[in-house]
Amino acid sequence: MHFETTKDGFTIAIGNRIILSHSPDKPAFFAGFGEERMDMYRGNFDIEDYVIERTALRHAEVSGDSVTLSSAPGQAPRLRLTLDGNAIRLTALDETINRLWLRVVAETDEHVWGGGEQMSYFDMRGRRFPLWTSEPGVGRDKTTEITFKSDVSGKAGGDYYNTNYPQPTWLSSRKYALHVETSAYSVFDFRNGDFHEIEIWAVPEKIEFFAGDSFADIVSALSLHFGRQPELPDWVYNGAIIGLKDGVNSFARLEKIRAAGTKVSGLWCEDWVGLRQTSFGARLFWDWQANDTRYPHLRQKIAELADQGIRFLGYVNPYLCVDGPLFPVAESAGYFATDVDGKTALVDFGEFDCGVVDFTNPAAADWFAEEIIGKNMLDFGLSGWMADFGEYLPIDIKLSNGVDAKLMHNAWPTLWAEVNAKGVESRGKTGEALFFMRAGFTGVQAHCPLIWGGDQSVDFSRHDGLVTVICGALSSGLMGNAYHHSDIGGYTSLFGNVRTAELIMRWTEMAAFTPVMRTHEGNRPRDNLQIDQDETVLAHFARMTAIYVALAPYLKSLSAEAAKTGLPVQRPLFLHYENEPQTYAVQDCYLYGADMLVAPVWKAGETQRSLYLPGHGEWVHLWSGKRHAGGRDITVETPLGEPAVFYRADSSHHRLFEQLRTIG
């Protein structure tokens, strides 16, 4: 990082790129204070800010590696910047400051990606993105009926920026990355052509910069900084993880699915803990131990599945329901977060209340990791689980570490991931047991081995359907999350919105070219088509699992590459074709490693797919073998069972890819 004083200010550059430019006429820093209103209803937040002061810190005094900022000469200094390697450390010199704004130099044709896992817009330029972990919303588009109904019935419609996994990090087409080290509510605003504005509801510890000669170099550096995941477990490559929550009937249904030729790696039964019925649908009983009524002799069943090479997976989240046996155990030990009166804080999760296990209390975190993850899950025979939630930390509770819950809210998903990882490590199962999360924040990369895209609607909608999963994979992948996957067929079914056979098949086609194939019955299984209820759907699903398994050698090579370099399995086109700006905003197709390009069909009724093939070499259409020159737009036929997939003609894996055509 290069710091240079100017006539009346300073500039900061990294890799010959000016990132910050400060002068009295165009200040880069603003400070002040505000009063926020934050209301949470079942994980959905209504947030407003009343800004009382926003003052430009126009005057800079430079002394060695530090800069002191004030509003004008002779005024009291309010902020100190200290240069530290490729970071700027910030110190508030005025205790009243609880709002900071920073303007980063921008170019008009610049593209910006990141922000954690973004589901609607991969290229964030031109929009404003609040960064606060929450439910992402149902519909996520204020122009749609489902979003409107979700807002009216449960304040749950959401918007384009809502995400389970925000992160104050971006990658710029100027070949640098920026990270704000804070857990406070923050906003990335990319609406101005001359600058990017960062808003933070605290003075952050530091702002870090990363630069490289290529996008891949920067992504690799980010992954090293935040932490890398181990390679995928070998058992995953055996086929799909079948999600069923049908009690003991799940085993018979699995046999039917396998009899159709489906390649299966695991049976995932969320309801291993039992069910409760709510107006939303069938919900789980949030007490994390095997339910003998729902699954009698489950330990024996798990052993029988293991003999057939099939793993068993379950479900857990960081809360305990008040009517379960684990709740009084945790409460008597003082493991729950408390309210203002010092009593256990209860959170409404939709017609039932839960306590929040306080992971800032080391004893509580250790108890959860050992007693629940260790004994109740791993020792019982589970090989993996959905580690759900993490976004619901109320902002008015009291925590063991004494830190304001508003500052711990964003940090909670990473603490949750750490508890899971600690339990896995305690049994020597790191890289063998596979848990997956939807919630995330800075540092989750070091603990969570697999991201899943959260709760999509069971449809083809632009902001909450199949296509959003691609955007989520690409954005989170740039942040150092190598592995991403989704619920095949989506999850959320409300207001008469139900799955079609076409949706399941198109989602399956995409999933076959992702790190993990996993089905989900959804929130209302009885209202929605399942893979074993339609012969055509099941036959299609079985074939796509065979393709996934046949691709395993290639996927293993990508997993090894991810562990070594941090590059994600699913990559934006520009990662390998950075000199082709037309790839910068592409978010509905992806590179599967460097050698494959996947363009899923994401609109209902479509049997053709138009896409851009990058580069100067030739691409081979996977199903027909026809060659296409790179560097141009093409349209191909995409009947069911043949998504638009291409591979590089000069790939060292070309023989493996050619064999996929023979799978009937």
Swiss-Prot record:
The keyword 4Fe-4S does not apply. Optimum pH is 8.0. InterPro entries: Gal_mutarotase_sf_dom (IPR011013), Glyco_hydro_31_C (IPR048395), Glyco_hydro_31_TIM (IPR000322), Glyco_hydro_b (IPR013780), Glycoside_hydrolase_SF (IPR017853), Sulfoquinovosidase_GH31 (IPR052990), YihQ_TIM-like (IPR044112). Changing residue 245 to Q: 6000-fold decrease in catalytic efficiency with PNPSQ as substrate. 250-fold decrease in catalytic efficiency with PNPSQ as substrate. 3-(6-sulfo-alpha-D-quinovosyl)glycerol binds at residues 135, 270, 283-284, 286, 438, 520. The keyword Cell inner membrane does not apply. It is an enzyme of class 3 (hydrolase). It comes from the Bacteria. Induction: Induced during growth on sulfoquinovose. It catalyses: 3-(6-sulfo-alpha-D-quinovosyl)glycerol + H2O = 6-sulfo-alpha-D-quinovose + glycerol. Keywords: Glycosidase, Hydrolase. The active site is at residues 388, 391, 455. One of its GO terms (molecular function) is hydrolase activity, hydrolyzing O-glycosyl compounds. Signal peptide: none annotated. GO terms for biological process: carbohydrate metabolic process. CDD domains: GH31_glucosidase_YihQ, GH31_N. Its EC number is 3.2.1.-. Belongs to the glycosyl hydrolase 31 family. Structural analysis revealed the molecular coevolution of catalytically important amino acid pairs directly involved in substrate recognition, as well as structurally important pairs distal to the active site. Part of the sulfoquinovose monooxygenase (sulfo-SMO) pathway, a D-sulfoquinovose degradation pathway that enables the complete utilization of all carbons within sulfoquinovose (SQ) with concomitant production of inorganic sulfite. Catalyzes the first step of the pathway, the hydrolysis of sulfoquinovosyl glycerol (SQGro) to release sulfoquinovose (SQ). Hydrolyzes both epimers of SQGro, with a preference for the natural 2'R isomer. This is Sulfoquinovosidase.
